[in-house]
């Protein structure tokens, strides 16, 4: 084995040792996107780390501010509502399926609803539909509450006149 092969082999071994640590693996996962506590716990356990190591890693990340379910839920709700135009009902179901606490979900959705202006988004969308009923059905399927749909449609219709 020549020097270059030996060096390559040692680099690979060193890299494997570094990624075997649960904290390094968790930080690697968090580098790509914000994750929820339960989601990260499952990923670490699936990787084969012991329960004590997983809990210690999660506590460390919480203390350092890398892991915050409330912030993650808010960012998730904001993205789903703003970019994918999902309503609160669908966002609530998605967050529940990710294992987020009910109180955190409600606060995140309220905060996201305060920040988003659906009226401008839906004004552009209105041209795709023949009439008001089609748009109403579309919004209901996307997870908007009937009262919110009526409020939005009234503002859109009021703004055109």
UniProtKB/Swiss-Prot annotation:
Family: Belongs to the RecX family.
GO biological process: regulation of DNA repair
Pfam families for this protein: RecX_HTH1, RecX_HTH2
InterPro entries: RecX_HTH_1st (IPR053926), RecX_HTH_2nd (IPR053924), Regulatory_RecX (IPR003783), WH-like_DNA-bd_sf (IPR036388)
The keyword Nucleotide-binding belongs to this UniProt entry's keyword annotation: no
Name recorded for this polypeptide: Regulatory protein RecX
Organism name: Thermotoga petrophila (strain ATCC BAA-488 / DSM 13995 / JCM 10881 / RKU-1)
Alphabetical UniProt keywords: Cytoplasm
Xref: PANTHER family: REGULATORY PROTEIN RECX FAMILY PROTEIN
Subcellular location: Cytoplasm
GO cellular component: cytoplasm
Record carries keyword Cytoplasm: yes
Protein task: Modulates RecA activity.
HAMAP family: RecX
């Amino acid at each position: 084995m020549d020097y270059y092969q030996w060096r390559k082999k040692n680099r690979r071994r060193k890299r494997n040792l570094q990624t075997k640590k649960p904290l390094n693996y968790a930080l690697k996962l968090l580098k790509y996107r914000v994750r929820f506590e339960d989601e990260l716990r499952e990923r670490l356990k699936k990787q084969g780390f012991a329960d004590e190591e997983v809990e210690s890693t999660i506590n460390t990340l919480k203390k350092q501010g890398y892991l915050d379910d409330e912030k993650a839920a808010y960012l998730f709700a904001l993205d789903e509502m703003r970019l994918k135009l999902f309503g609160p009902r669908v966002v609530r179901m998605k967050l529940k399926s990710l294992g987020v606490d009910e109180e955190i979900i409600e606060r995140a959705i309220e905060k996201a609803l305060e920040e988003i202006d659906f009226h401008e988004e839906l004004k552009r969308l209105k041209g795709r539909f023949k009439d008001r009923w089609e748009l109403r059905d579309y919004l209901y399927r996307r997870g908007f509450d009937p009262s919110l749909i009526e409020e939005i449609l009234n503002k859109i219709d009021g703004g055109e006149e």
